């Protein structure tokens, strides 16, 4: 396996370097024998009772708080097997994760949850939503779990420190740290079939995220959940972290999770326009306005180019979809668009639910 070969070469190179350093030190010790010999093995063991508690706001303190609330999930089904991560929502077994984690095994797949204390429990799907890539599962027979503290992603700032906790490559309770690299990053991931795309309004982070981190926690330095780790960018044939990870903001994840718990289904905000993911226009070109939809009622015409949602710049269709889906049905947004003759207009649009026509 190429991955293992590369790892083995790295380990050998590291051992050789260490061996070279050890040889040089040993030769110096033999030549210079005039001074006293000091041996670390003879030193007394440190007083473990005097070790200071992790300072508040440190990665260690965050890990101590968050690790018990993050789980590993194994999925086994007729169409495949996989694994991911999840975060505990309730003491009686509700767990938040990604849809693509639980969907990997197909319908009827068996889910097993592994907790940080080494215990396991079977789980069933409460509800899953491919559009938002959010799912909620419930473990059986547990009433003593530690729910994660929910924070807010609305006040996040670029450069703010964050910590990711999950099970990359099955390595449970892995903790990595980084910063918020960008906000409101539209990221397109695969849906349930080739005709459906899930565009998330993502938090971008350089905290190391790898396969298996999906569904895990992105938290602030107080250990509060700010995002659900979902996707990574890769370069060429690489499949590991290159410092470009993406998380679903907790506000969106929380709203969808609550709907899944309450009804088993999720709703998504729409404005009733068709736009290409990308084209030559700087903005989202409206190729079709749905009759009597929110955009139509607000007066947005065909061929308009939407350039802003509230105070957010819209650069293409994906960024428009991400911005709208980050809102709840019934929210009012200010949409700024340009007409083909160059005139710019701002209108209020009340979003509708995509479930209205079901």
Residues covered by each model-derived region:
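C-terminal recognition in membrane/secretory proteostasis and scaffolding
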Residues: 1-36, 255-358
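A conserved glycine-rich beta-strand in the N-terminal activation segment of trypsin-fold
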Residues: 5-10, 53-59, 74-92, 110, ...
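N-terminal activation segment of mature serine protease catalytic domains
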Residues: 21-85, 134, 258, 357
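Catalytic-histidine neighborhood of serine endopeptidases
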Residues: 27-33, 76, 91-92, 96-131, ...
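Interdomain regulatory linker/hinge segments that flank or connect interaction modules
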Residues: 30, 43-50, 228-271, 352-355
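Active-site loop architecture of trypsin-fold serine endopeptidases
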Residues: 78-84, 101-111, 145, 165-179, ...
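Gly/Ser-enriched beta-turn/beta-hairpin loop segments
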Residues: 79, 103-108, 116, 128-132, ...
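Active-site substrate-binding loop(s) of clan PA
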Residues: 124-126, 143-172, 248, 258, ...
């Amino acid at each position: 396996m190429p991955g293992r070969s590369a790892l083995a070469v790295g380990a050998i190179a590291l051992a050789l370097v260490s061996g070279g350093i050890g040889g040089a030190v040993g030769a110096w010790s033999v030549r210079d024998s005039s001074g006293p010999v000091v041996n670390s093995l003879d030193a007394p063991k440190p007083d473990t009772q005097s070790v200071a508690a992790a300072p508040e706001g440190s990665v260690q303190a965050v890990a101590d708080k968050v690790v018990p609330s993050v789980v590993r999930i194994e999925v086994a089904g007729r169409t495949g097997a996989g694994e991911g991560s999840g975060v505990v929502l309730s003491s009686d077994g509700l767990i938040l994760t990604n849809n693509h984690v639980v969907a990997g095994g197909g319908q009827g797949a068996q889910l097993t949850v592994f907790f940080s204390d080494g215990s396991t429990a079977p789980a069933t799907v409460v509800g899953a939503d491919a559009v938002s890539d959010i799912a909620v599962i419930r473990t059986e027979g547990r009433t003593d779990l530690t729910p994660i503290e929910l924070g807010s992603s609305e006040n996040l700032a670029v450069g703010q420190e964050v910590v990711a906790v999950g099970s990359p490559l099955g390595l449970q309770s892995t903790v990595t740290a980084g910063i918020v690299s960008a906000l409101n990053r539209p990221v397109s991931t695969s849906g349930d079939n080739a005709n459906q795309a899930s565009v998330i309004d993502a938090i971008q982070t350089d905290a190391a995220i790898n396969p298996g981190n999906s569904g895990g926690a992105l938290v602030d330095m107080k250990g509060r959940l700010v995002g659900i780790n979902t996707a990574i960018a890769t370069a060429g044939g690489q499949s590991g972290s290159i410092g470009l990870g993406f998380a679903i903001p907790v506000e969106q994840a929380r709203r969808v999770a609550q709907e899944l718990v309450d009804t088993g289904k999720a709703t998504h905000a729409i404005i009733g326009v068709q736009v290409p993911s990308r084209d030559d226009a700087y903005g989202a070109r409206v190729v079709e306005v749905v009759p009597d939809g929110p955009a139509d009622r607000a007066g947005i015409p065909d061929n308009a180019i939407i350039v802003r949602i509230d105070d957010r710049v819209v650069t293409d269709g994906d960024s428009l979809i991400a911005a709208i889906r980050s809102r709840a049905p019934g929210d009012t947004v200010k949409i700024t668009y340009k007409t083909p003759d160059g005139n710019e207009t701002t209108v209020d649009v009340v979003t509708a639910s995509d479930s209205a026509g079901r």
